[in-house]
């Protein structure tokens, strides 16, 4: 899988950064693209990338603030003409996302040529699709804001060839049945496939956060994640200023990384008061501390393998 950032600024765009938008490419598990938040100008950012809107099957909105949703109506309209015709779309988000989209479409007299399935979250959500499991949990941002825990399908354990030979089953087409079915038959006897396979392995886990100040659900979402995408609107200065505005400080994110055993962290939603030079200087200062965990400040169009 691969995470690509189309917007990394907080609140307002800058000359170097667009507002929030993240794409998750599901290959090799699926050929679909999932988007997380659609800030203003997202569709224009996507034009500079190989990703096509027609491959976007799901959009997950973290919360209803403008820097996370103002690009949604335009992107949905353009999808009709960029390979999305008659291809269903699932839109997941807080209560109000359906009304926002439908009112935007109605008032602008825009007509979509594909169906949208809306899923509005209350407190939490568990959603299954193509072997993926997505959990949404409520954060602390003053308005309903959610973090998404995306779990890729399990990988079936390796076949125990010796065990199969011991029951007289030599390598051949039957092995595929052992790998892909719960049971198989050999010489008139039914066997449990799991007895002839190694343990299944959980696929990669990606945690993608909306805006939040520290809260207990953060650890639920990010536990043992392979990749965590988290906001740090404030990357220097007093921590209490970030929390007063229901945002996270870089120190909050570092604490979460250690508590939740996160392998790699990608930090986005940086305040527009920081320019590229500021961010680079702060990064160099932070990584000189041996206690600093593994992280990156991301910029627009950065991509990371999961």
From Swiss-Prot:
It comes from the Bacteria. Coiled coil: none annotated. The keyword Zinc applies. GO terms for molecular function: 3'-tRNA processing endoribonuclease activity; zinc ion binding. Its EC number is 3.1.26.11. Belongs to the RNase Z family. Zinc phosphodiesterase, which displays some tRNA 3'-processing endonuclease activity. Probably involved in tRNA maturation, by removing a 3'-trailer from precursor tRNA. Homodimer. This is Ribonuclease Z. It comes from Staphylococcus aureus (strain MSSA476).
């Amino acid at each position: 899988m691969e995470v690509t950032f189309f917007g990394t600024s907080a609140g307002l765009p800058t000359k170097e950064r667009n507002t929030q938008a993240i794409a998750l490419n599901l290959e090799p598990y699926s050929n679909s693209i999932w988007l997380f938040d659609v800030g203003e100008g997202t569709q224009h950012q996507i034009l500079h990338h190989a990703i096509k809107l027609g491959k976007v099957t799901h959009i997950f909105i973290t919360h209803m603030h403008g820097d996370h949703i103002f690009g949604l109506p335009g992107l949905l309209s353009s999808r009709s003409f960029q390979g999305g015709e008659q291809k269903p779309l699932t839109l997941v988000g807080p209560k109000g996302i359906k009304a926002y989209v439908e009112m935007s479409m109605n008032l602008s007299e825009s007509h979509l040529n594909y169906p949208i399935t809306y899923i509005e979250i209350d407190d939490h959500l568990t959603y299954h699709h193509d072997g993926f499991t997505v959990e949404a949990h409520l954060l602390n941002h003053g308005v309903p804001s959610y973090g998404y825990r995306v779990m890729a399908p399990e990988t079936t354990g390796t076949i125990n060839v010796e065990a199969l030979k011991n029951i007289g089953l030599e390598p051949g087409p039957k092995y595929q049945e052992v790998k892909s079915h719960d049971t198989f038959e050999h010489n008139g006897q039914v066997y449990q496939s799991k007895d002839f396979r190694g343990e299944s392995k959980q696929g990669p886990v990606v945690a993608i956060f909306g805006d939040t100040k520290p809260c207990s659900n953060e650890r639920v979402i990010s536990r043992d994640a392979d990749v965590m995408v988290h906001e740090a609107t404030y990357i220097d200065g007093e921590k209490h200023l970030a929390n007063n505005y229901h945002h996270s400080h870089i120190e909050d994110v570092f604490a979460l990384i250690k508590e939740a055993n996160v392998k790699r962290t990608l930090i986005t939603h940086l305040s527009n008061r920081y320019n590229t030079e500021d961010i680079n200087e702060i990064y160099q200062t932070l990584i000189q501390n041996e206690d600093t965990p593994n992280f990156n400040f991301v910029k627009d169009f950065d991509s990371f393998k999961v």
